[in-house]
Structures are given as structure tokens and as C-alpha cells.
């Protein structure tokens, strides 16, 4: 079956122009067929058939896939292919004309994108140069010291390091804002390519373009936006083709692999993508290429980490975070096989009287200090904490499931609460006042740790990146955030729409919607299973959940 692409005139016209310039007389027209009939009457039936085969082959090669709607048709228009010299003569003007037609065909979405860009400009004007979170200082320190972090993998510091010569936190904010816009464009482009009208392709892109929590993460020195961007663009590229070309498979694999070293929750996603592609019946060789490409950044980073700490890992804190996960329910009295050296991590308080899981990582009173003193992320402490957590899950599987389901309940709740337990607070809202960088105690650790000439002062400038609130832009964003955000319940509905589309296509293993939906579901479930709940973790699932719903 040959699909006819009527939704992407820019790509279609550019393909026509390139074919005009390079194909010459490769695709036969009526004149060529007539000449063949005059020279060789016996070939009158053969020449048109050969021309059709050449045309079909050319379409397939240009599409980069087998049987995919990859530009094989041209909107039902006849495709004349004049000689190469004639095509080259008017190429520049025709490129401009074709691009203009393409933009005109998508003007409605262009208006939406313009509003989204303007909104991000308001954020940048209202909070200059960028906003900070407690993790932000560590990312800056890692960027200037070139040492793998034990707590957080260094994929985001690599990004900051690439921008270090420009010494501009405003540029960091601008690039992250651009990533947010491009994610919305990617969702729209894939859905238009798959046949949705402009409004049907625009709706799934709206949460990415206008959700206030997305806007704030884009304006913070945090790894989340880079992680979401890499995963979203990689999956969108894989949904662009039925059979992704080798080049696309390599690029998508590298992006997914790099996302795993930006945030370690992305490590299982490579396996999720591979399984989803195989179920979608993508050529196994192309899936293998994607897998190998995805392993390159992961294995390379693990080797680099090993050169510093003597172990092959992405970080040294997975056991500690899993311990914080089980801290809300673990009771040593219900763990009869607990080793004596692990009992030091028991909390005698009843589960309903315990603090948030974050306290078991960062507080000075965490039981982890009994093992390692002030360094709760030492190799020994992480190993002991991880073993305790595994024993707790094995001994109390029902309690563990209840804890995970409770956090999932926060994910899909209608209202967002401001409490330490649910991981939502002033840090993830636009405020009328922001804490100056110089008043944050963590800064002193950064200044001590970053001893080389590219310290925080050099990266952020003389003001150390101290944020400034500017009116009336900040007031606009404070009012905006009260209305324009994606409620958790609506995210649940979006996931259900994607699931319904997959079930309806069960004979084809869910079709194209399976891949983005599976990755989105994994991003919703993995954080509550391995660490705890935070609203910023949920945002990673939104773009792909919307893409899956659109494809469904």
C-alpha cells in the first residue's frame, strides 16, 4: 500500500526540488514513453512498467523506510521530473516558494508556537537570569570539575560544560526554552504526518507548550528538560517511520543512551524502546543498531566512572535512594531474615509517625550516618542501604505495593498539594521573591569544591547567577500558574486514551502508539518504585503520553 502524504508540503516540495536537480530523466514521463514506443514497438508495455518501478523505488529510497508514509506520494499530484540542468536553474527561487507554501499550510500551529515563544520570553524577563534549585549548585560544580558525581550522573553537567566558554546562564535558560518549544513542534509534526488535521495535531502539543511547570523547569538549572527533550525527540523520530532508517536508529539510540546518563531513571528506557519496536515488527537489524548505539554513551560513561571510583556504574546512590523508598513502611520486626549488620538502618518509630522519604537521604539524623558518618553516599553505605531495601521489599511486598500506589495517587490527583511528603513546594512555583544564591548554604560547598579557574564565579559571572524578580512579568507568571497547568487527573485520562488505542489495535501490538505510551508509562511508574514521588518527575511522561494519545 502506498500512502499519500498530503500533510507536509515543505518536505514534499523539497523532495521534488532535489529530485529535479539530481534525477534528470530517471523517472520517465509521457515523452520518454512515446520515444520508447517509436524505437521499439515490442517494449511499449515494458517501458511504462519500468518507469513505475523506478518511481516506486525512488520514493522508497527517499522515504528511508518500507511501506511507511514517508513522502512516497505527493498529494495526488503528477510528478514530472525534468532534466537536471533545468531543475538547477530555478532551484533557489523554488526553494523559497516551497518553504513559503509549507509555512502557509501550518499557519494555525505557527500562531500557537508564536504564543508559546512569547510566554517563554515573559519568563526570562520576569526571572533573570535563571532560577535555582538545591541540585543546581552540584550540577555547576560537576561541570567545572570534570569529575563524575556519585549522586547524580553527569550528562547534564556535560551540557553545561559545552556552554561554559560563553559564561551565560541566560543562554542556558534560552536553550532549555527552545527545547520545550521543539518538543511541541515534534509532537505536532509526527501527528500531522500520520494524518491528523491541524487542530488534532495541535491539541496534544499544548501541554508541552503551555504547562506552567514545564515552563519553570525550562528556566531552572536542572537536568529534567534536557532529559525530557532527548527522550521525546528520539521517540518522535522512531514514530516518524514505520521502518526507521539506519541513520535514524543510530541517532535515536544515541539520544536515549545519553538520556540515561542525564538521569539514571532513563537507563531502563532503552530496553523498553527495544521491546516496543520489536513488537511493532521493526526490522530486527535496525533495532539491534539502535540498541548498540544506545549502549555507547552508557558504557562509555560507566568506564569513565570506573576510572575514578573503581566500579562500573552510572552513580553510587541507587541503593541509598531505594532505602529512602522503603523507609515509609519498612518494619524490622517483619523482616526475620535481616542480617545483623543491616539492623542499624531500622527506624523504631511507627510508619505513620515517620518523616518524608527525603529525610532519610539528606537529613543529618538519617540512620545512614551510623554507617558512614557524614558521607551517606559512600560505596559501603550505598551497598548496605540497597541490601536493606531489597530485604524490606521481599519481606513486605504488599506494603511496598501500597507505597507505590499511594505515590501514583499523588500523580493523578486533581489538585497539587504543597507538602514535603508529596515533593511539591515553593521550589516548583513562580514566586514574588526568590532566595538569592549567596544565601544558600550549598553555595559554600560549591565554592570549596570548584577550585579551578572555571569556578562558579566564572560560569555565572560576578553576580554568581543571583536571580532577580522583575515586574510586571513575574506577576503575570504568578497569575498564569494558577490556571494553566496540566492536572494529574487529565494526565491519567491522556494515558487511558493511549491505552485504549493500543487495545483497539491489539492484532498489531498497539501500532505506533505502543512505543510512546510504553515509555510514558515507564516514566510514571519508575520514580515511585525506585526513589519517591515528585511532581517534576511526572513531567517527563507528559510529552510522550500526549503523542501516544494523538496516535491512538
What are these regions (language model features)?
Residues 193-195, 234-249, 277, 281:
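Membrane-interface transmembrane helices that cradle and orient dolichyl/undecaprenyl
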